[in-house]
Amino acid sequence: MRRIELTLRADRSFPVPDSDGYQVYGALLDALDTVDASVSQRVHDSPLGTIHNSGLRGSFAGSDRPHHKRVRANEPYGLSLGVVDRDDEELFETLVNAFVLDGDDIRLAEGTLRVESFESSNATHEELLERASDVGSNATLDVEFHTATCIEEAGEVTTMFPHRVSVFRSLLGKWNRTAPEELALDIGREAIAGSVIEKPDPRAYDTHSVLVNRVENGDGGTRPLFRQGFTGQCSYAFKNASESVRNAVTALGMFGEYSGVGSAVARGCGSVEVGLE
């Protein structure tokens, strides 16, 4: 799995939606399409979303337009992209070609951000499990949910709270769909519920409704599709957890920085930063 960290900068100020991940996703597809149309189409069609896109991270100005903010001129913005499918080395290389070798920009609806710097990191599922096994038994996972995290519980019902079962079961599904068969994790709801305690920071908690797609109406037009989710900070501590459960949950937490948490991660949702204490 790979993670790409881009630093972006705009020459002029321009508006972007409050939930800018959807626009960034479209810009990424456009950039991929200029290099390899088949890869772009596969990303668009993938049920996993294939990539995790953090959306723009940085300091924004206010906007007169409803539900918008403004990119500041000459202000640095971060963009994190994660690729977790082991078959997607091609995708990673295509992104490198688009943004580094070809000097491409992120072209949004109202303006452009140029790529100023680029860093990449990689890991395997096995390496994350090895790192997790080195963590002490009293460790705490500190998770910052940077963008709206939309976890579907049943049908179209989404959770609006960073509950331990919801968060780590979401990550477990992503892990087992992308890991080699011999590294699949078998950890049930009861094990997570009985071994992990979540401690959210009420001062940082917020809820959101964000645009993630546009779908066709019966009359040939389109309508916006929204997802509901939460942002904030939450610590996850262990209580009487077995070593296997502790290692699995810790590895899943680290995996979340590559995969994102919940649904619509390719469109800017579920971007997290994880620390260990």
Give the ranges of each region predicted by the language model.
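RNA-interacting cores
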Residues: 1-277
